[in-house]
Amino acid sequence: MYQSYPQQQQPGYQPQQPSHPIVGAGAAPTMAPQNPYGQQPFQPQFQQGQYQQPSGQQYQSMQQQFQSPQQQAPTQPTHPDRESYQTALPANVTPGWNDPPSMLPSAGTTPNRLSNMRRRPVDPSISGNVGYGTSSQTSNPYGASASPYGAPQQNPQQYQEQPQSYQTYQQPQQQQPQYGQQQNPQQFGQQYPGAGAPHQQQHYGM
């Protein structure tokens, strides 16, 4: 790959070099600056091609290096592993040391024993399924209707308090248009077009 490009460079540069004396004396100064400019872009192009070649070969060689251990890594350990499973055990090792326990003869007894052992002890004072279904409402310390967060009747009171708090904040705003600043009620009316508070401001102001 390296030899092909210099062979192309030599015939390419040879006709350009004798072209200087062949051309007339008047055309020589005009062609002379053009040829070095023409040669300069050619040189980096060939150099880039030369640099690309070893890079490609390096990548190929690296790929070969990476591929070779990948191919060797699975092949080398797999064969002794397969052979070790197939080979007989030494005399010191008992034949059934690693066999799983046979679950067929004791299949009916062991799961019941395990379930009985894992079950938590039950208090005799507890009767029925406490905490499941409808019986959980009766065992509520807060009562069947009440919730630990409070009675549901407090929610409408909270919603009623909110407009009152808005009115308290809007009362100092009512004093502003009385002093002649008429832009503030217009701005608040634009910000809250659907609320009834700006209408209340006008009634209070009147």
Swiss-Prot record:
Region: Disordered, residue numbers: 1-206
Top-level division of the source organism's lineage: Eukaryota
Entry protein name: Prion-like-(Q/N-rich) domain-bearing protein 96
Protein source organism: Caenorhabditis elegans
Residue spans of biased composition, Low complexity class: 1-19, 33-76, 148-194
Polar residues biased stretches: 126-142
